Amino acid sequence: MYITDTRPEKVNGFVIPFDASDPSMAMSATVADTAATIICRMDNGAVVKSLHGHLRGHGNYVRIHGNRGLMENCRHGEKNRLRVWKEPWEKKRGEPTETVYRPDFPVRHGEATRTGHGGGDFFTTYHFLEAIRTDKSPYLDVYRGVDMSIAGIQAWRSVLDDSAPYEVPDFRKEAARRKYRNDHWSPDPGRAGKGQPPSSILGRFEPKAEAKDLAREVWASRGYVTDRNQRLGNHRLTRI
């Protein structure tokens, strides 16, 4: 969205169901599916594929195909490098077809590179604080933030509707806000009620006892002791 100054208009969601024969899923206390893909249709006609979940070969990779070349972060060796590719007939004379380099952030490079997700963990907080300091709205303002988050909600609606396309409403428009004003659709068990969806395409199910026991041990080792996620030392979780 930032690079192309576009927003998603429609989404299709697809999932790989929960696999009880996969130890990484069976021993998890979460009630969710293995992985998911969201296909977003942007308002300029572009298509974005977002793949995420509990798949082997974990990594954070971005690949962008434009009409003047390709840019992606490297999947081998130093993964913070960028690879830029231009077709031989589209590049300038003397310009290489392929360039691989490690970029610097234009601001706060040192601090950003010491945080996770390639600097993303730093810049989310940095730009939030800059908005407070300067009283200026950042590019990723509340509406663009909603655009990004509601794409996932609508994609889950799509999953439960045989992956049919669903709109991503633009809440800058009063008519769209009015249409969804009383929409409280959520798979959160804390909001359970009539018409609320499950968090897995397989429906509602309970993690097995061994998975819950393991979760208690892990969370206790990190100091979480209650279902309110209060940090009170190294006590055990009382419940999930």
Q: Can you say where each PLM-predicted feature lies in the sequence?
A:
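Rossmann-like dinucleotide-binding domain that binds NAD(P)(H)
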Residues: 1-47, 51-58, 143-147
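A short beta-to-alpha transition loop/helix N-cap that caps and shapes the active-site region
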Residues: 19-22, 72-74, 168, 175-178
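Acidic surface patches and DE-rich sequence motifs
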Residues: 42, 66, 92
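Residue-level detector of conserved, well-ordered beta-strand and adjacent loop positions
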Residues: 51, 65, 169
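Surface loops and adjacent helix of pleckstrin homology
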Residues: 53, 74-77, 171
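C-terminal helical cap and adjacent loop that interface with cofactors, partners, or active-site loops
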Residues: 58-62, 88-240
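C-terminal, non-catalytic macromolecule-binding modules
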Residues: 77-93
